Amino acid sequence: KADEKLEQALRQWADKQLLWKYPTRSNLLADHRKSGVKIFWVDAMGIEWIGLLHHLLTKDGQVDCSVRIARGNLPTTTEANKEWAEGEDIERGLDDIAHHYAYKHPQSFLKAIEVVQSIAYKALALLSKHSTVVITSDHGLSRFVVTSKKRIDPPEQAVADSIGRYAVLGQN
C-alpha cells in the first residue's frame, strides 16, 4: 500500500536524520538578498508542488529554472518561519485552501493546482522586472497528516501544540 511505503520512507528518513543534510533556507536567502534577487514567498507550499511549478515555469523554454531544496525552522509553523522582508511578495492561497474546514477532494486539490498556476504566472511577470526570482516557502503541509487515522501519543510530560503538529518536550 502507498501509505505503508510512504510511512516506511519517512521513518527511514527520520532515523538517518537526513533533514540536517539540507542547507537552511535562512542562509540561502541571505546570500540571494545580498545580490539583490527578488524573493517571492508562498505560504505552505511543500516540495510536492515542485514538479508542477517547474513545468509551468519552463514549458516555453524561456526560463532557466533550478531547484534547491532547503530546510525551514522547527517547528514548521508560519510563526517560526516568517522570514519575509519588507517588499517581498507573499502568496497565501495554498495555506488558505489547506486550512479551510470544507476541504473536499478533488475540488480543493484542483483549487490548489490553480494557485500553483497563478504562482508561476506571477513569477514570470516578476521576471520581466527582475533578472532572478527566488520562489520559497515558510513551510509545507500535508493533507496526509490530518486524514490519517493513525495517532501517536506524545511522550510523557510533552505538550502538544498547533493542533498536534508538534510537541514541546519537558525540561528534564
How would you describe each model-predicted region?
Residues 1-172:
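Feature captures the catalytic ectodomains and active-site-proximal regions of enzymes
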